[in-house]
């Protein structure tokens, strides 16, 4: 049972909003005030916040790597057309990305496969960790897809993104065929990072969805600096020291989140154990 529990959650408790747990887009998740209230009413041996970067962000990657992503959805002809509409810098293209920021305390939850995450703990750092996808045996099936530790990788942040018609350079209309959609960035700026590690980011403390391009992790201070303060709390996570503290926290959160219209939800190891018991 504990193997199942560990696969379902990486912490004793994870708290956020229903939107987060139900994969709904939102402008706001759990608030600092709500986190403070929970922290004041529970006894944590480890705690911290995961943040969503709420600003358009991209990581530059090789065209071959991005082609691997889109080859799952597009024909060869569609793929060639798609790649031709992307901005290129040599053999590099601008790929979508999901950047999550973490409090320093939560770096303990990452499994480091290569490299070292300690540079991310230093003040005013430019270190980034790339989150990788492992197979069922814990192996990295496609290492060539990812940048290497020590590589410099460029992130582009933008204030806004709109789609234009690549034939005219004007904003797209409802009559513009999809093959002519092209992104146009406003207020774009580049930041160069050094890849310090390849890590496994537990799904239960991530965005909980994937996509094309890289998933990446920054320290919250670095993310706030480079995104212009666009990192907002997405989840609050904590562990407890013993069964007594765990039971008390479970009781508190159960009451806090009771009711159909509660602004908060939570997952815990206790709820995962309950789910496992129902499966048996």
Language-model features: locations:
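Basic-flanked hydrophobic alpha-helices used for secretion and membrane insertion
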Residues: 2-277
